[in-house]
């Protein structure tokens, strides 16, 4: 039995989905343990290109059981739409290969509405939300003002619980935002539609995971976003509202006593970021546009152009520490093939001094990048499958990053396809 977590080291969008898709051949169960429909995992396989927002990336592997844990913001509407899209491409989804925790809280119809209303209220001080209802959902969860998926199985208890929540939530909608209130009829129609559709998948996933572990099954925990978006350790308040770090995987999966044997941190060969907040090594103008086009850097959920720049050694080293990574997967190395020189943010300058630690969020905007560079390789490496077949300049770049961040780079991706990977 072996448990592994695949996590993001930076701002998210590092390529976690393709790594889960690759490694699931060695695992029996894949678990999503936090987040909701606010970020996408891109998977490219023989069935096409998919942007998964809620479904675990193991859904494409025959024989793999996929679990949505209690830490997930369960958006029934988006989940069902995503399921239908995947099914239409010939992928089977049944209660045998998809299990939803009865303790996962439901993202309710007003959560997305409140997200948009609050971003509009904040105007130029907005957080850059994807407007998928994530912050209002987690706020309500911790105020105990939402319902668990398991309550869908007990309608009388569900309606009693929702009545109290609805009265409280309408006060916020009407008095704070001047918005139209919701009704119980609205909620019952929503439950009759999307709630009924996911009911067959709801079960005690904690019991399932414990039994799988007892039987010697290998479990893979899949995170959303990355270290720098973690609610506690990220660039607060420009973070998500959950904990993408590996330490939360046992809690958010429904299997709190689980031990994680291997933590694969995913790092892009350059930096990208969606949303607001400090981004120390950001590029602008033509320089940014070339990298954005080369890497296809547009949000999987929103389609927004991602902010881009060179790899940030300081932020990456910090992200690795937050995750406790044992191995690194360096993705999209092939994207840098157009550059004569590969730029690297090696350190920061803060208060007139050069530093190699990640600053406290309040003073991070004052940090400036201290740059270095290495020779590029200027050739197509997308067909390379062996480490020794990479150009020397590409190997030198990978080895430099490895030394600077202090963690072994075990996997190097050179393309989006499942087999476009070099294992060192």
Please name every model-derived segment.
Residues 1-424:
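Non-transmembrane, aqueous-exposed alpha-helical and coiled segments at domain scale
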């Amino acid at each position: 039995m072996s448990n592994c977590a695949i996590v993001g080291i930076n701002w998210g969008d590092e390529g976690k989905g393709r790594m889960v898709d690759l490694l699931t051949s060695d695992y029996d169960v894949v678990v999503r343990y936090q987040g909701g429909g606010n970020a996408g995992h891109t998977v490219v396989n023989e069935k096409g290109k998919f942007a998964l927002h809620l479904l675990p990336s193991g859904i494409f592997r025959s024989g793999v059981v996929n679990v949505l844990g209690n830490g997930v913001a369960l958006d029934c509407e988006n989940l069902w739409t995503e399921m239908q899209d995947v099914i239409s491409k010939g992928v089977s989804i049944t209660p045998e290969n998809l299990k939803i925790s009865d303790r996962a809280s439901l993202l309710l119809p007003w959560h997305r509405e409140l997200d948009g209303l609050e971003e509009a209220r904040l105007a130029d001080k907005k957080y850059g939300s994807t407007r998928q209802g994530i912050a209002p959902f987690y706020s309500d969860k911790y105020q105990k003002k939402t319902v668990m998926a398991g309550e869908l199985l007990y309608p009388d208890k569900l309606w009693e619980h929702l009545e109290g929540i609805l009265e409280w939530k309408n006060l916020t909608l009407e008095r704070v935002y001047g918005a139209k209130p919701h009704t119980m009829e609205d909620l019952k129609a929503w439950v009759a539609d999307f709630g009924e559709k996911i009911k067959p998948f709801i079960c005690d996933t904690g019991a399932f995971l414990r039994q799988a572990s007892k039987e010697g099954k290998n479990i893979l925990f899949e995170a959303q976003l990355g270290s720098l978006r973690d609610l506690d350790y990220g660039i607060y308040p420009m973070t998500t509202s959950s904990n993408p770090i590996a330490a939360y995987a046992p809690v958010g999966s429904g299997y709190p006593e689980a031990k994680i044997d291997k933590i694969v941190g995913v790092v892009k060969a350059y930096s990208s970021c969606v949303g607001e907040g400090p981004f120390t090594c950001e590029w602008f103008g033509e320089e940014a546009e070339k990298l954005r086009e080369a890497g296809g850097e547009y949000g999987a959920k929103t389609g927004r152009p991602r902010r881009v720049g060179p790899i940030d050694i300081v932020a990456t080293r910090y992200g690795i520490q937050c995750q406790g990574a044992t191995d690194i997967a360096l993705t999209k190395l092939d994207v840098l093939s157009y550059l004569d020189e590969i730029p690297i943010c090696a350190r920061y300058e803060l208060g007139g001094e050069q530093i190699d630690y990640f600053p406290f969020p309040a003073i991070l905007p004052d940090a400036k990048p201290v740059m270095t560079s290495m020779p590029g390789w200027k050739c197509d490496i997308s067909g390379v499958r062996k480490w020794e077949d990479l150009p020397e300049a590409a190997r030198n770049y990978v080895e430099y990053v490895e030394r600077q961040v202090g963690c072994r780079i075990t996997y190097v991706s050179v393309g989006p396809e499942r087999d476009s990977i070099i294992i060192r």
